Amino acid sequence: MAREFSLEKTRNIGIMAHIDAGKTTTTERILYYTGRIHKIGETHEGASQMDWMEQEQDRGITITSAATTAAWEGHRVNIIDTPGHVDFTVEVERSLRVLDGAVTVLDAQSGVEPQTETVWRQATTYGVPRIVFVNKMDKLGANFEYSVSTLHDRLQANAAPIQLPIGAEDEFEAIIDLVEMKCFKYTNDLGTEIEEIEIPEDHLDRAEEARASLIEAVAETSDELMEKYLGDEEISVSELKEAIRQATTNVEFYPVLCGTAFKNKGVQLMLDAVIDYLPSPLDVKPIIGHRASNPEEEVIAKADDSAEFAALAFKVMTDPYVGKLTFFRVYSGTMTSGSYVKNSTKGKRERVGRLLQMHANSRQEIDTVYSGDIAAAVGLKDTGTGDTLCGEKNDIILESMEFPEPVIHLSVEPKSKADQDKMTQALVKLQEEDPTFHAHTDEETGQVIIGGMGELHLDILVDRMKKEFNVECNVGAPMVSYRETFKSSAQVQGKFSRQSGGRGQYGDVHIEFTPNETGAGFEFENAIVGGVVPREYIPSVEAGLKDAMENGVLAGYPLIDVKAKLYDGSYHDVDSSEMAFKIAASLALKEAAKKCDPVILEPMMKVTIEMPEEYMGDIMGDVTSRRGRVDGMEPRGNAQVVNAYVPLSEMLGYATSLRSHTQGRGTYTMYFDHYAEIPKSIAEDIIKKNKGE
């Protein structure tokens, strides 16, 4: 089957936003206008096409990024709907990795919200071009100008409107296109009938002023345009469009549009902007990988059907009908169903059973995937998130994804023996799907411990075990993942010597431990001169330190953010061994614990609480009583917003407390921000508890 849409006519986009900004509804409308669905499903009725998991429909939020394909104006648009809830940031991170562009949806009343900032930062890390859609223009308190100002103030983004709304709230009736200086009026409720009219007289000055600001913002990124602008020369529509496209693709400018997805206004114009301004796979820089056989050698995966096949698996999920589905993005070459591919990350050969083009939760079988496509494969047994798939003769590894460690843990216990086996299977499958979800058995207690990015994250996973795998389990109280670190430096010796007849054991190391920067992790430096510790034992010293650091030095929590410099030592020709040096390194760490001022660290969450003004005093007092540090307040519409950093241990069960403090009128979001030292008195309690005193 030949290629249906050329690479120039392909767009791979994500739709990202804060929870409740209307992201899923926006995607629904895109599918409606592109003819993919015939009846529009509303999220608040639990009937949305993209939210297909039962937990999503119950809660009205999007958890897994469903991938879907639509056609618009002769182009193929592959859309990934990403979750806006903070516990699911990993889903966003995964999808951004494989996108060429994104639409950031803002709520016209709130503008940029905390989760928007997080997702925006992630998109900037991956260099994803974006357009901004200010949604909910029909909502009470909708304010387009305010929303645009939050892009500048909170994100320092070079953004400018390419559209202006006429009216807001109930009066929102038309949209002015500043590039072509036209006006579009909606004449029916489904938004399918649009009338092009002249810009009304009373809005002309405002539109001309906004167009001048737009040209100025874009001209900053284009010398050619700047010359024309400064010389007061006429700038044609095609020149302006091309300059906006260039600046957007280079992530130097963000066009801002407006509309209301719920009331069906502005979505088609937003689709036009996706085609006009977001890049095709040919417009973005080719992805650079390296050879599996030689990590130093760079390999380019070019968007070209005739090149070697290379793809990245970005999501694994279990489908009730076809089993394990692996979603992947093709960067170069083509692949047919039934063929063999190589998983170069794991060095395994895999057979692709069937290829599916996804549409929320329905699917269409296809024979071939081409470069630039996003599809799902059935039959890949060993492939996980972040793995590279390539042709059998190829051995490219594309840059993988890094995922954060869990910050909260729970114990789960099956209710019956029958549940035991099912639970093991369920945990294996859920870990395959979600790299931030960890499960292990505690060696001392025999309990199964699961870890994730927040209470909601674990709630939903326990819920899925029950609904999808029929596993009934009892859930223990949440446990916070503490860490340990050193505050000062010291030089120490670790010596292991044992003679017990026959061959002995001997290893001797001198190591300097120093604190590392926050978040930098463990760094090992080999500074041995003259072979006082033979080269073959150096990896054992590093491995010994890493193993010992897993169990910490104070209360059994992993030791992080430490530098270790091996600068001296000695060995014995006969008695030295890898094991002896491993043990010597762990003894050095024990010695360092006495001299390096170890402390316990706790996860600090960035918390944003929104509530009516009258509860402000109560909430501030409550945050302080939870050892929180208030980081600022601001009005948002007729509500107040408090930003704070609060220890996770103090935020467990906060939803119930906030509800009672605000009579159910407050909302909050939180996500992990950093680790910070815990107060001494609390640290002492934790140490005692862990030692069973």
From Swiss-Prot:
One of its GO terms (cellular component) is cytoplasm. InterPro entries: EFG_II, EFG_III, EFG_III/V, EFG_IV, EFG_V, EFG_V-like, EFTu-like_2, G_TR_CS. GTP binds at residues 17-24, 81-85, 135-138. Residues 8-282 form the tr-type G domain. It holds the Pfam family GTP_EFTU. It is found in: Cytoplasm. Its main location: cytoplasm. One of its GO terms (biological process) is ribosome disassembly. SUPFAM superfamilies: EF-G C-terminal domain-like, P-loop containing nucleoside triphosphate hydrolases, Ribosomal protein S5 domain 2-like, Translation proteins. GO terms for molecular function: GTP binding; GTPase activity; translation elongation factor activity. Keywords: Cytoplasm, Elongation factor, GTP-binding, Nucleotide-binding, Protein biosynthesis. The keyword GTP-binding applies. It comes from the Bacteria. Catalyzes the GTP-dependent ribosomal translocation step during translation elongation. During this step, the ribosome changes from the pre-translocational (PRE) to the post-translocational (POST) state as the newly formed A-site-bound peptidyl-tRNA and P-site-bound deacylated tRNA move to the P and E sites, respectively. Catalyzes the coordinated movement of the two tRNA molecules, the mRNA and conformational changes in the ribosome. Belongs to the TRAFAC class translation factor GTPase superfamily. Classic translation factor GTPase family. EF-G/EF-2 subfamily. This is Elongation factor G. The lineage of its organism: Bacteria, Bacillati, Bacillota, Bacilli, Bacillales.
